[in-house]
Structure formats: structure tokens, C-alpha cells
């Protein structure tokens, strides 16, 4: 009986040792991102590690490096989304790293559905081509909800949808579906993106 008790205690201690680093890791990972948009205001995004852990971490890493500071929303479409994160500003650029696409078509279950306020990764035809470009859905249109399973949603705007709406209203490309804003002076600029602690 004594031997069994000792073994149980040892097993319990081992389990606690294994779980502690995992718990600490979850507590320390960045969960909220603040984006200050020049002339518009602040957007606060809550990252979703449960549905898109690789994508959320990649985004947080880029934010911590200051990657997004000074970049613009180069593609803005009414009743669809605003897209940014391209250092070239052409829709063709990205960071030096590409990540696995965390969406159903690529074999990954992602239960964060595209709807107004959801933040998702842009990509090319290659499922694993997402890098730094992201978009924020600005409506619940069929164009938006139809993205489920095809793109990796990884966060949601919890404050600042009025900012997203203002950007949409003032810089939309009404007749340029799929294009980019050619007049760079009209683009909304990310003044600063940073990791924050957030309390309601």
C-alpha cells in the first residue's frame, strides 16, 4: 500500500511539472493588439489561439517586431473588408516568413467564423502562403461569410469598429473589386501596432 501511495504521489508531481510550463506559456502569450490608425483612432484586436494558434502567434510576433508600424490599408472594399500589412503596398508583399493556412480547405478545423469584426489572413492561391497581410471584415455580407473554410480567421475586433467603418467610408474602392488604392495619399496608415494588456 505504501509503495502504491509513493508511486501515485510521484506520478502526480510529474504531471504537475509537465503541465506547469504549458500553463505558464498560455498566460504569457500576447492576447490583445492595439493598432493606432493615423487620423482615425484605435482598433483593439483579441487574438484567437484556440482556433488559429500558428496564425495568432505569427501576427503577435510581427507586432512585437514593429513590422506593421507605418504600413497602410492598401485594399478597402465596402461591405467586405479592409486589408493591410503589405510592406510594398501593392498587395504582393509580405514578411520573410510564410505560415500554414489554418482553415478547413487546408485540413485545419477553425471554428472562428468570418463575420463583421473578424480578423483573418490574406493569402495567394497557395494555401500556405499567408505571411503578414491581414484583413478586417466590415460587414456580414455573403462575400464575408463565404470566406469560412478558405481563409484563416485568427482574431476579432473588440474595440474600434467605428474606426474600421470610417476607413471604409473614406477610402473604399467602389468599382475596383480585387484591386488596390492607387492614390497612396488616401490610404489609412497604421501609426503603431503594439501588444497591450486589456481590461474592460
Task: Specify the residue positions occupied by each region the protein language model found.
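Sec-dependent N-terminal signal peptides of Gram-positive bacterial secreted proteins and lipoproteins
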Residues: 4-26
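Cyclophilin-like peptidyl-prolyl cis-trans isomerases
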Residues: 18-200
